[in-house]
Amino acid sequence: MVELDADLDHIVPSVLPPFWAKLVVGFVSLLCFARSYDGDFVFDDSEAIVNNKDLQSDTPLGDLWHHDFWGSKLSSNTSHKSYRPLTVLTFRINYYLSGGFHPVGFHVVNILLHGSISILMLDVFSVLFGGLQYTGKGQRVHLAPRASLLATLLFAVHPVHTECVAGVVGRADLLCALFFLLSFLGYCQAFKETGNKEGTHSSTFWVLLSIFLGAVAMLCKEQGITVLGLNAVFDILVIGKLDILAAVRKVLHKDKSQENAGMFKNGGLLFRIALLTIGGTSMLYIRWKIMGTGPPAFTEVDNPASFADSMLVRAINYNYYYSLNAWLLLCPWWLCFDWSMGCIPLIKSVGDWRVIALAALWLCLIGLIFQALCSEDSCKRRILTLGLGFLVIPFLPASNLFFRVGFVVAERVLYLPSAGYCVLLTFGFGALSRHTKKKKPVAAIILGILLINALRCVIRSGEWRSEEQLFRSALSVCPLNAKVHYNIGKNLADQGNQTAAIKYYREAVRLNPKYVHAMNNLGNILKERNELQEAEELLSLAVQIQPDFAAAWMNLGIVQNSLKRFEEAEQSYRTAIKHRRKYPDCYYNLGRLYADLNRHVDALNAWRNATVLKPEHSLAWNNMIILLDNTGNLAQAEAVGREALQLIPNDHSLMFSLANVLGKSQKYKESEALFLKAIKANPNVASYHGNLAVLYHRWGHLDSAKKHYEISLQLDPVAVGTKENYSLLRRKLEQTQKKDV
């Protein structure tokens, strides 16, 4: 749009050639988020990446097409139904190239993706602001360079993108956006004017390619399918130049003139729309079939408004959520990793002052829609229509209009809609510049927004580098969010700071009295601190609120076992296994219960079940070896130990246990080798040196025995057994010396 570019002449004074403009955009976009390159895996990264077996070579590649984003089977009732196999495939490639779970490689890919998307945005915005125009050679002319550069810079430095770029799971949104834009630009290629029959075939090819790229975008994230809707809007309103207001007037006045009807007969519009419709319907059908058991089941804490009884309350709150999303685009200062669990209290009546936000949102939207429909300036109509299209259409899957979503507000879903916001903001700056004589204040405002947003990106990227910083940054934004307190507590507990963790877990339970995961974790800490009575109360309440909470049932069983209430403990363990059949840790704890009751066969069976379900379950293997050793079944203990070491060859505790068995079987040489390997792996364990000393003592290697007794006593000076054995050895050495004399 020449007029808009002229309006921005004093704000973006020099016209950069497309190559240099893309270079500037790429550099700025990378610079803003570069700080996150060496961050940890945080928040959802743990489940989607670190704990996702689909990333590892043990899982066949074909399984990716049957699993959700988190690695669960889509057919499972507990699946979130997030079907993003291409995104998971990129994680798997990252894992392979990085040689494991090294986050730097994952983060660098995300940063580069954002840079690539920002560069592509320059071409997209050129179409939105300047329209489509091709040279005689079929190359698209880069129109409205000033407006497209400004809008792209606003997009590149928008802080709301931090979650997508700095959080590795945000790659789903980045890949979706990449193929979304490629699909849109591909659709634009369908309108080259070649003037021959081959041009029709070329047009069909580009439309089909656009649909294919839309399908790829959807396989990265579900939001990708909305590009087909945007392409249809672009075709009808921009290419077809449909004047909606004029069409409505004709319908109201029963005007039968063919002025607007001609557009449906020229340029193959109906054919292209038919292709888009067939493609979109097919994609939706296949997606629904893949989903299997129906839509995912969300809880009230995930999306409280969707569980409200009154349709009016639901509508008010949904619209309030839209206004919050709009505010995050307009003023991205209050950013939070999670907006659920009381972060945004429900609006229950029209008397709530927050209803003003709804009114403000719709006042702005209606004003923009009116301008988009009624303006006599076709360029203005195009910019506003496509700006609103980019803002609204990609947001529709997150709007709760078609199905319930599992969140209240999510910054990641604003990645694509923010492009529409940048279009509208740039258009607004152009209008402001046109109607004011002093251009420098407008330029200063734009420069200020770019610098402040860039600085905010850098700060926010730093907060996403570690879970501790990320969770603590949310306290000032959402102090009523129980999940924020829960995550801070969990992080502190992982660091070993149980006292501080208890404080945050208690606050999480206070804010949400039905927060069973906080109750479970708090109960666990209290159990470890031997505060068994309160631990039992919390865990009992957790399973009462959520009867199928297997982890809470298991932990309740551990507490009951500690309280010597063995029958209740066994029942709790059995209930946990009923709700989670493949639960190796529960079988392990059940085995410990049976061992306490001297039900040795049952204990061995339980531990064997644990190792079948989880072959690397070292504790279960160890307990089997020790129990068989203590009951005199040395041959069986040796067989189990060898089997365990074949599966977990570098486990020093298994080496130690098997070495003890071999020593008792007088296989001294092999026992010595295992003891030495265990000590090499973990040299600071007193019992390793002490038991090796006992082996040497029995074997008659008294000097070696003396050496390892002394090392063991240095590590643990109060070990009674070691002190007694060392005294016996010293007496024996003294007697030997006397005989020699």
From Swiss-Prot:
It is found in: Membrane; Endoplasmic reticulum. It comes from the Eukaryota. GO terms for cellular component: endoplasmic reticulum; membrane. Keywords: Endoplasmic reticulum, Glycoprotein, Membrane, Repeat, TPR repeat, Transferase, Transmembrane, Transmembrane helix. Pathway: Protein modification; protein glycosylation. Residues 1-10, 132-146, 186-198, 246-265, 376-382, 434-441 are cytoplasmic. The chain crosses the membrane at residues 11-31, 111-131, 147-166, 167-185, 199-219, 225-245, 266-286, 355-375, 383-403, 413-433, 442-462. The lineage of its organism: Eukaryota, Metazoa, Chordata, Craniata, Vertebrata. SUPFAM superfamilies: TPR-like. Glycans are attached at residues 77, 497, 609, 725. The keyword Transmembrane helix applies. Pfam families: TMTC_DUF1736, TPR_1, TPR_16, TPR_17. GO terms for biological process: endoplasmic reticulum unfolded protein response; outer hair cell apoptotic process; positive regulation of endoplasmic reticulum calcium ion concentration; protein O-linked mannosylation; sensory perception of sound. This is Protein O-mannosyl-transferase TMTC4. It is a multi-pass membrane protein. Disruption phenotype: TMTC4 conditional knockout in cochlear hair cells results in postnatal progressive hearing loss. Mutant mice have normal hearing at day P13 and are completely deaf by day P26.
